[in-house]
């Protein structure tokens, strides 16, 4: 007889201090013979005719059919958490109760869950940003009680329109509420999402008899306690061992950024089966795919994956990997929680995540249904800088929160994010983050027409957020120990999750003293050279900004055609590994550009000129970040090669500090750049009546380029073609 998964149960009531169901009473929870029949039908549809609930899964299901039950399941990937809520759903529906609401964090995860529920004989639907045209029909089916399972994202749960139309109707008659990946509810967790706190509001609005299940594979003792507290006093916590016997973990020696790309390209064909190569940024997904194809040819079966792709494209790529039609997806963390491919043969990380818990969650995609999967990480000294950014980027800034609350209090009507950006001078992304954090503490509320202050007093809890930051830094320290190979890798991951059963695995590169068969400690230099050559020949399109930010800038609405730059080109995009030496040298220290950078600029113009309406008539050098030697060096070289006149546009020293201000809103930047970027007489005379090739040293926001193009057009330039040497993160 087949059982779903192979983990044993540990009921850890004393560890979290919020559980009132004792281990002995939990052990007494069983299903009736009739319920076993329903469960058998669901499980046979999911996993074959011999599938049965194990004793630990049965206890969870038996608890969930009790009125008002609160259950938190912390079990390793592959244990069968989803089987618990599909069986519980079937039992509730058999009793004539309402549908199950599943809160799930990712579209990829929701799609897999819908497919699994449908295999189990349940009518499952999802409401998400990718199926807006189906919302009305889905809501009508819900009102007619024709849906067994509704899956939504936490962001959808927080949407006031959805709450009014759907949640208010369901709250009193839900059969079961499921919070998947529940560690995201806790701001002590590695993947806290403020919108998940909307779950607490749903709990308060629920019929108190509605059972609630929260599931995760990545919660340490503190996160477990926090989630259990939010669920309620009588929460039953079911927790099992988290080590994964099928995974062979390995840490490779530190390599230069380009060497990591080359290592993946060289070793990918030898890795078992199909798998995932995780990278830290969206830009890395495209660059690494190009590096792999540079070595193995343009038709090599590999593709990039990120949350920015259209839903249909993500689904196509997920299916291609699931069906082994491609060797690997090079992916950001958007392909993570819940992606279901039991025979995933490998996971390789190019750059380490900031948290061992996040790392455990991602490598947990591998080896779920096979005996062996290879897992490796290629660390870099640059990883710690990324970790520092993520440690603080989601924490509220008290000054910005007070500004936003003041702006809301000053207006009688709901305010949009755009309006708040303009009135506070805080950039849009930070406004959105602060609003979500303030909404968690109910200081603001999102209405249909915008955001309003609730009138509830708000105080920045410095001790709480200092504790969160300290916790994240402790996790980063554990990740540093992991990369240093200080002890068994699986044991260290399990210990980071407070697993009492953690112990040496006997399989990892620390336990064996060796890398997996066929893995080298460095790539061949020939492969490194091939990858460098191909990547340095590529250039990204720089799309011009088309709208003014409004606010203090005094400029609002669409940028007129007579003030607009044409699409440009970028030579070095963010942290491009092929340009690591230049980024550490002239693009940081303001030194003359190396020959490979000026040659790349010439190649960019050669490939770009087919899109020009007219050939440039003059080259202008502009250095808003103060890298004057870089801007003038590249501009002068291009002018000499193209036999064009060349002129430098000098800027005051204050310009560099403005370009480096990451917190300044667009309106504030445009206002200051408009003051700083007055066109000198020499530049105006050289550019009037001509197409300008504008060579810019570096920029992050590109507002300096937008304003410079406007000023040049207003003083007579017929067009502006920006060549941005370094697009900063």
Predicted regions and their residues:
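A glycine-biased structural micro-motif
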Residues: 413, 687-690
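C-terminal accessory region of SF2 helicases/translocases
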Residues: 348, 352-361, 367-568
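Helicase motor core with emphasis on the C-terminal RecA-like subdomain
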Residues: 28-36, 41-45, 51-82, 87-93, ...
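PRPP-dependent phosphoribosyltransferase catalytic core
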Residues: 706-729
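Interdomain "pre-motor" coupling segment immediately N-terminal to P-loop NTPase/helicase cores
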Residues: 5-31
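Active-site-facing substrate-recognition patch
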Residues: 247, 531-618, 628, 632, ...
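Short glycine-rich phosphate-binding loop at a beta-alpha junction
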Residues: 211, 614-626, 693
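Active-site signature of alpha/beta-hydrolase-fold catalytic machinery across serine-
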Residues: 86-87, 91, 226, 633, ...
């Amino acid at each position: 007889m087949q059982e779903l998964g192979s983990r044993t149960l540990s009921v850890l009531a004393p560890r979290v201090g919020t559980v009132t169901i004792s281990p002995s009473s939990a052990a007494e929870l069983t299903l009736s013979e009739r319920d076993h029949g329903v469960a058998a039908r669901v499980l046979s549809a999911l996993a074959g005719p011999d599938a049965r609930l194990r004793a630990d899964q049965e206890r969870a299901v038996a608890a969930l059919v009790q009125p008002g039950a609160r259950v938190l399941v912390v079990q390793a990937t592959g244990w069968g958490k989803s089987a618990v809520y599909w069986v519980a759903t079937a039992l509730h529906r058999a009793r004539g109760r309402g549908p199950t609401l599943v809160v799930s964090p990712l579209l990829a995860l929701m799609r897999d869950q819908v497919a699994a529920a449908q295999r189990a004989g349940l009518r499952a639907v999802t409401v998400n940003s990718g199926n807006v045209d189906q919302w009305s029909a889905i809501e009508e089916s819900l009102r007619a009680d024709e849906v067994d399972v509704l899956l939504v994202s936490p962001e959808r749960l927080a949407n006031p329109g959805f709450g009014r139309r759907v949640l208010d109707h369901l709250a009193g008659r839900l059969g079961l509420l499921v919070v998947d990946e529940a560690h995201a509810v806790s701001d002590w967790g590695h993947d806290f999402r403020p919108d998940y706190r909307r779950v607490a509001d749903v709990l308060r609005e629920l019929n108190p008899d509605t059972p609630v299940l929260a599931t995760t594979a990545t919660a340490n003792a503190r996160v477990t306690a926090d989630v259990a507290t939010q669920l309620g006093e009588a929460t039953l916590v079911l927790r099992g061992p988290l080590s994964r016997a099928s995974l062979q973990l390995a840490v490779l020696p530190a390599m230069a950024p380009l060497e990591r790309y080359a290592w993946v390209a060289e070793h990918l064909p030898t890795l078992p089966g199909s798998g995932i190569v995780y990278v830290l940024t969206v830009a890395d997904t495209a660059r690494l795919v190009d590096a792999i194809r540079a070595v193995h040819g343009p038709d090599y079966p590999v593709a990039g994956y990120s949350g920015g792709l259209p839903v249909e494209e993500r689904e196509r790529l997920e299916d291609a990997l699931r069906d082994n039609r491609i060797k690997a997806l090079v992916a950001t963390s958007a392909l993570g929680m819940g992606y279901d491919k039991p025979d995933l043969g490998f996971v390789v990380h190019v750059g380490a995540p900031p948290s061992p818990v996040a790392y455990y969650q991602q490598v947990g995609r591998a080896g779920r249904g096979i005996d062996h999967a290879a897992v490796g990480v290629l660390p870099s000294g640059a990883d710690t800088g990324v970790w520092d950014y993520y440690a603080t980027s989601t924490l509220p800034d008290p000054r910005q929160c007070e500004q936003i609350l003041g702006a809301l209090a000053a207006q009688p009507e709901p305010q949009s994010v755009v309006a708040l950006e303009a009135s506070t001078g805080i950039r849009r992304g930070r406004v959105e983050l602060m609003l979500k954090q303030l909404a968690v503490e109910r200081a603001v509320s999102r209405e249909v027409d915008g955001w309003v202050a609730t009138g509830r007093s708000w105080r920045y809890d410095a001790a709480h957020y200092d504790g969160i930051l300290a916790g994240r830094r402790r996790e980063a320290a554990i990740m540093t120990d992991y990369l240093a190979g200080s002890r068994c890798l699986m044991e260290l991951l399990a210990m980071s999750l407070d697993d009492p059963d953690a112990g040496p695995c006997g399989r990892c590169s620390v336990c064996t003293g060796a890398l997996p068969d066929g893995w080298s400690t460095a790539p061949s230099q020939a492969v490194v050279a091939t990858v460098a050559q191909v990547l340095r020949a590529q250039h990204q399109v720089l799309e011009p900004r088309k709208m003014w930010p409004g606010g203090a800038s005094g400029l609002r609405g669409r940028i007129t055609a007579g003030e607009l730059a044409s699409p440009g080109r970028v030579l070095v995009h963010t942290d491009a590994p092929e340009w690591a030496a230049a980024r550490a040298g002239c693009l940081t220290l303001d030194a003359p550009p190396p020959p490979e950078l000026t040659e790349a600029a010439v190649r960019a113009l050669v490939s770009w000129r087919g899109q020009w309406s007219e050939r440039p008539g003059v080259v202008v050098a502009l250095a808003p970040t103060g890298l004057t030697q870089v801007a003038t060096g590249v501009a002068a070289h291009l002018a000499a090669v193209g036999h064009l006149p060349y002129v430098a546009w000098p800027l005051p020293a204050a310009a560099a500090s403005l370009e480096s201000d990451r917190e300044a809103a667009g309106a504030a930047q445009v206002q200051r750049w408009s003051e700083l970027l007055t066109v000198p007489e020499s530049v105006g005379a050289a550019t009037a009546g001509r197409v300008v090739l504008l060579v810019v040293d570096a920029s992050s926001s590109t507002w300096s380029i937008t304003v410079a193009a406007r000023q040049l057009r207003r003083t007579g330039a017929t067009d502006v073609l920006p060549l941005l040497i370094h697009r900063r993160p």
